């Protein structure tokens, strides 16, 4: 049958991604992490969703690949976290 995947808490997902940025991430979990890091949704164009962060000069643009987040977009987020010193708002 269809198993309903449970949401991963942003803090847990963040830890998992720091360990291995190549893992598959459900798009909704990825979005939850983005918001938990302090990003706000600025606009949607087709399947592309743009997020802005007060500390980041550039937009983070994401779109799902099926139900998952695209790997390069996950990596882009991790780069931004490192570059701008973003932290989870727990």
Residue ranges and their predicted role:
Residues 1-6:
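Short, Lys/Arg-enriched N-terminal segments with co-localized hydrophobic residues
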Residues 7-11, 15-32, 36, 42:
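A charge-rich, low-complexity, intrinsically flexible signal that marks solvent-exposed coils, linkers
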Residues 12-18, 61, 82-85:
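Basic helix-extension-helix modules of the SAP/HeH family
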Residues 24, 45, 67-71:
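Short, well-ordered coil↔helix boundary/capping segments
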Residues 32, 49, 75-79:
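N-terminal, well-ordered alpha-helical segments
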Residues 33, 37, 80-83:
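Conserved short hydrophobic interaction patches
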Residues 36-62:
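A short, structured beta-strand/loop element
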Residues 65-90:
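C-terminal structural segments of small proteins and small subunits
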